[in-house]
């Protein structure tokens, strides 16, 4: 096996007590993706021989949530980071190198890890930082020549050592040929009664192996999450970076600080996104698309020159070109809109194909339907697609005019150029060019006197 073989171990067994959550800490999300999933994806970009994830608390939840190709190893007792890596030993190559990462350090990037791996060579690589406040973190101990000799955890540090500002991020590169012996020789004789992975630095020095420190270029890249405040801080950093990338690519963000991207956005030119918009999953926006304030767009494709008015929610749908959607519109999964469609306020469309030029401007539900072109839905139109057990399909032709406050009871078919009178309940098929009325005749009662309250 070549000496440059890379194994990756991701430690994700911690409970996360300070998160005050029933969810395992590593499943809390940054940018809509669980932290541990982000770390796995970053590790995978390095093309390692394998990725080994050490889990413990909430193991079942983690395995059910994160669908990634990895070796999953359970740490039944949380006895420290050294013990966690030892748990993964049977899955690591006897030669090459092992990169140790953490499931709660979500913003570590490929560039930083490649720099660390290059610096480490076949020796030990150590990622360090000099944060504004090093409290609670392990300190880097150097000798008179500046070489790293040890890492001391804060609980075990002397008063002098606590004045050191350079800290250990926990991310290490270790030679596999030495790793097993080093791990087996670890002691838990320390303030926390745990097996510290950081003690391997002193063992490397004792064996004459050079420790190559690399300082991270930005503290947030190696920052861990221990509570909701830190989670929110990293989320905002992540979102700021996402917004800056979109701005560089030509997207207009009315306020970059009030925009969230929780997935991937593919976009054309001259796209404009107003404030408080959330993009989730896989979203594609064509040229000249405008997204109004307070919209949520999830797993959707929106064609060129379409405008999404404020407070609209689009999920799992496809919108053609030159559409006008909203305000307060909802497009649900499998809504498929052709070009030049208008969907107005308080209109909901689900699992329906809408033809070119069709309009539903207000207060309408269209579900499980196939609608032709240039059809108009009057206000208050409802497609009653559910009989309490099964969903049924409605077919509506071209240039149909549906009067206000109509109910179309599925399964039902309306031919081309059909007109329905306002207030009709349509339960039977209607042929082309027909007018259908299905409502009670109006009755006017002569001489009727409205009751009045007794004023006494």
UniProtKB/Swiss-Prot annotation:
<feature type="region of interest" description="N-acetyltransferase">
    <location>
        <begin position="250"/>
        <end position="456"/>
    </location>
</feature>
<dbReference type="GO" id="GO:0009252">
    <property type="term" value="P:peptidoglycan biosynthetic process"/>
</dbReference>
<keyword id="KW-0548">Nucleotidyltransferase</keyword>
<comment type="pathway">
    <text>Nucleotide-sugar biosynthesis; UDP-N-acetyl-alpha-D-glucosamine biosynthesis; N-acetyl-alpha-D-glucosamine 1-phosphate from alpha-D-glucosamine 6-phosphate (route II): step 2/2.</text>
</comment>
<feature type="binding site">
    <location>
        <position position="226"/>
    </location>
    <ligand>
        <name>UDP-N-acetyl-alpha-D-glucosamine</name>
    </ligand>
</feature>
<feature type="binding site">
    <location>
        <position position="365"/>
    </location>
    <ligand>
        <name>UDP-N-acetyl-alpha-D-glucosamine</name>
    </ligand>
</feature>
<keyword id="KW-0961">Cell wall biogenesis/degradation</keyword>
<dbReference type="GO" id="GO:0003977">
    <property type="term" value="F:UDP-N-acetylglucosamine diphosphorylase activity"/>
</dbReference>
<keyword id="KW-0511">Multifunctional enzyme</keyword>
<dbReference type="GO" id="GO:0000287">
    <property type="term" value="F:magnesium ion binding"/>
</dbReference>
<keyword id="KW-0012">Acyltransferase</keyword>
<keyword id="KW-0808">Transferase</keyword>
<comment type="function">
    <text>Catalyzes the last two sequential reactions in the de novo biosynthetic pathway for UDP-N-acetylglucosamine (UDP-GlcNAc). The C-terminal domain catalyzes the transfer of acetyl group from acetyl coenzyme A to glucosamine-1-phosphate (GlcN-1-P) to produce N-acetylglucosamine-1-phosphate (GlcNAc-1-P), which is converted into UDP-GlcNAc by the transfer of uridine 5-monophosphate (from uridine 5-triphosphate), a reaction catalyzed by the N-terminal domain.</text>
</comment>
<dbReference type="GO" id="GO:0016020">
    <property type="term" value="C:membrane"/>
</dbReference>
<dbReference type="InterPro" id="IPR005882">
    <property type="entry name" value="Bifunctional_GlmU"/>
</dbReference>
<dbReference type="InterPro" id="IPR001451">
    <property type="entry name" value="Hexapep"/>
</dbReference>
<feature type="binding site">
    <location>
        <position position="168"/>
    </location>
    <ligand>
        <name>UDP-N-acetyl-alpha-D-glucosamine</name>
    </ligand>
</feature>
<feature type="binding site">
    <location>
        <position position="75"/>
    </location>
    <ligand>
        <name>UDP-N-acetyl-alpha-D-glucosamine</name>
    </ligand>
</feature>
<keyword id="KW-0479">Metal-binding</keyword>
<dbReference type="GO" id="GO:0071555">
    <property type="term" value="P:cell wall organization"/>
</dbReference>
<dbReference type="GO" id="GO:0008360">
    <property type="term" value="P:regulation of cell shape"/>
</dbReference>
<dbReference type="InterPro" id="IPR050065">
    <property type="entry name" value="GlmU-like"/>
</dbReference>
<dbReference type="GO" id="GO:0019134">
    <property type="term" value="F:glucosamine-1-phosphate N-acetyltransferase activity"/>
</dbReference>
<feature type="binding site">
    <location>
        <position position="350"/>
    </location>
    <ligand>
        <name>UDP-N-acetyl-alpha-D-glucosamine</name>
    </ligand>
</feature>
<dbReference type="GO" id="GO:0000902">
    <property type="term" value="P:cell morphogenesis"/>
</dbReference>
<feature type="binding site">
    <location>
        <position position="422"/>
    </location>
    <ligand>
        <name>acetyl-CoA</name>
    </ligand>
</feature>
<feature type="binding site">
    <location>
        <position position="226"/>
    </location>
    <ligand>
        <name>Mg(2+)</name>
    </ligand>
</feature>
<feature type="binding site">
    <location>
        <position position="153"/>
    </location>
    <ligand>
        <name>UDP-N-acetyl-alpha-D-glucosamine</name>
    </ligand>
</feature>
<dbReference type="InterPro" id="IPR025877">
    <property type="entry name" value="MobA-like_NTP_Trfase"/>
</dbReference>
<feature type="region of interest" description="Pyrophosphorylase">
    <location>
        <begin position="1"/>
        <end position="228"/>
    </location>
</feature>
<dbReference type="Pfam" id="PF00132">
    <property type="entry name" value="Hexapep"/>
</dbReference>
<keyword id="KW-0963">Cytoplasm</keyword>
<protein>
    <recommendedName>
        <fullName>Bifunctional protein GlmU</fullName>
        <ecNumber>2.7.7.23</ecNumber>
        <ecNumber>2.3.1.157</ecNumber>
    </recommendedName>
</protein>
<feature type="binding site">
    <location>
        <position position="404"/>
    </location>
    <ligand>
        <name>acetyl-CoA</name>
    </ligand>
</feature>
<comment type="similarity">
    <text>In the C-terminal section; belongs to the transferase hexapeptide repeat family.</text>
</comment>
<feature type="binding site">
    <location>
        <begin position="102"/>
        <end position="104"/>
    </location>
    <ligand>
        <name>UDP-N-acetyl-alpha-D-glucosamine</name>
    </ligand>
</feature>
<feature type="binding site">
    <location>
        <position position="439"/>
    </location>
    <ligand>
        <name>acetyl-CoA</name>
    </ligand>
</feature>
<keyword id="KW-0460">Magnesium</keyword>
<feature type="binding site">
    <location>
        <position position="332"/>
    </location>
    <ligand>
        <name>UDP-N-acetyl-alpha-D-glucosamine</name>
    </ligand>
</feature>
<comment type="pathway">
    <text>Nucleotide-sugar biosynthesis; UDP-N-acetyl-alpha-D-glucosamine biosynthesis; UDP-N-acetyl-alpha-D-glucosamine from N-acetyl-alpha-D-glucosamine 1-phosphate: step 1/1.</text>
</comment>
<feature type="binding site">
    <location>
        <position position="104"/>
    </location>
    <ligand>
        <name>Mg(2+)</name>
    </ligand>
</feature>
<dbReference type="InterPro" id="IPR011004">
    <property type="entry name" value="Trimer_LpxA-like_sf"/>
</dbReference>
């Amino acid at each position: 096996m070549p000496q440059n073989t890379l194994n990756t171990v991701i430690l994700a067994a911690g409970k996360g007590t300070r998160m005050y959550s029933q969810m395992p800490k590593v499943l809390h999300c940054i940018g809509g993706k669980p932290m541990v999933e982000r770390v796995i994806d970053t590790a995978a970009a390095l093309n390692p021989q394998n990725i080994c994830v050490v889990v413990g608390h909430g193991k079942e939840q983690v395995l059910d949530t994160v669908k990634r190709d990895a070796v999953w190893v359970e740490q039944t007792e949380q006895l420290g980071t050294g013990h966690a890596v030892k748990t993964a030993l049977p899955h690591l190559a006897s030669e090459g190198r092992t990169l140790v990462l953490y499931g709660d350090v979500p913003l570590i990037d490929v560039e930083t890890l490649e720099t660390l791996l290059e610096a480490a060579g076949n020796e030990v690589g150590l990622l360090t930082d000099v944060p504004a406040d090093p409290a609670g973190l392990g300190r880097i101990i150097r000798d008179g020549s500046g070489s790293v000799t040890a890492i001391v955890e804060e609980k075990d540090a002397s008063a002098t050592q606590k004045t050191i500002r350079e800290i250990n991020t926990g991310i290490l590169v270790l030679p596999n040929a030495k790793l097993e012996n080093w791990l087996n020789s670890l002691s838990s004789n320390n303030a926390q009664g745990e097996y510290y992975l950081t003690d391997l630095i002193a063992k490397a020095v004792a064996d004459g192996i050079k420790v190559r420190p690399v300082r991270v270029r930005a503290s947030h890249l190696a920052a861990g999450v221990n509570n909701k405040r830190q989670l929110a801080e990293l989320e905002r950093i992540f979102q700021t970076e996402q917004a800056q990338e979109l701005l560089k690519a030509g997207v207009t963000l009315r306020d970059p600080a009030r925009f969230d991207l929780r997935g991937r956005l593919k976009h054309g030119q001259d796209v404009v996104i107003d404030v408080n918009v959330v993009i989730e999953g896989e979203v594609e926006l064509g040229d000249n698309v405008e997204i109004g304030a307070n919209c949520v767009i999830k797993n959707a494709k929106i064609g060129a020159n379409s405008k999404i008015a404020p407070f609209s929610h689009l999920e799992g749908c496809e919108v053609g070109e030159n559409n006008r959607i909203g305000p307060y519109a909802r497009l649900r999964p499998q809504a498929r809109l052709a070009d030049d469609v208008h969907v107005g306020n308080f209109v909901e469309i689900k699992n329906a194909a809408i033809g070119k030029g069709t309009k539903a401007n207000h207060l309408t539900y269209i579900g499980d339907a196939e609608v032709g072109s240039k059809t108009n839905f009057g206000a208050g139109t409802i497609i009653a697609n559910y009989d309490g057990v099964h969903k049924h399909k409605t077919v509506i032709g071209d240039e149909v005019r549906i009067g206000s406050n109509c109910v179309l009871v599925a399964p039902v078919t309306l031919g081309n150029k059909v007109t329905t009178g306002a207030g009709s309940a349509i339960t039977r098929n209607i042929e082309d060019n027909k007018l259908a009325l299905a409502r009670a005749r109006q009755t006017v009662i002569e001489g009727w006197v409205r009751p009045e309250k007794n004023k006494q």
